[in-house]
Amino acid sequence: MASTHHQRRHAHQGVCLNIIHRIALACALLAPGLAGMNGVANAAPAATFGIEVGNALLCLNQLNSKYFYDYLFEAFGKPYKTEGGAYWFKAAGSNIWGMEITDILVNDSSSPADFIGAVVNGTPQALSDAITKSVGIRYTLDDAGKYSLRQSQAGSVIAYADTKAKIYCAKSKYLVPGKQ
């Protein structure tokens, strides 16, 4: 009995260390892409842009729409539109995972979910490949259709957005933790 408990505890520690390793790797690998970023609009993105926004898009961070609205407002100025339950910010010249980000969106108060998303100048397959190469996170296709969604184990989704890709992480505002 004690051996089984020890094995489960050891396995849990291994999973935690693996997650911590992936986050550290993501931070290290996203940082080189920051050197080529050009700021647009009112200000340049903070040096932490690739880490903060990248990890949120990968569903590796908690989502807080107020925090990300303020962060994006500071980096890019006023949103250029409010549509579909989201504030849209122009982010031309920004790069994450070696891919150009054209727009970033964060939910407004009308949305039933907290989410952050980005429109990427590239195909969903190219974005999926870039993320896998940069941080080791893999996406699986929901089905074999041409416009199939791709989803990571953490819940991040890559979809078609006209001729570009859109990546997002969404969490319901109404989910509450279960009893332990």
Summary of predicted features, one role per range:
Residues 7-27:
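Bacterial N-terminal signal peptides that target proteins for export
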Residues 22, 42, 70, 74, ...:
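Polar/charged alpha-helical tracts
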Residues 31-40:
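C-terminal segment of classical bacterial N-terminal signal peptides
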Residues 42-51, 103-116, 149-168:
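Short, surface-exposed loop and linker segments with low hydrophobicity and enrichment for Pro/Ser/Thr
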Residues 44-103:
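N-terminal secretory signal peptides
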Residues 55-58, 63, 122-180:
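Non-cytosolic coordination micro-motifs
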Residues 90-148:
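Long, charged/polar, surface-exposed segments that mediate recognition or autoinhibition
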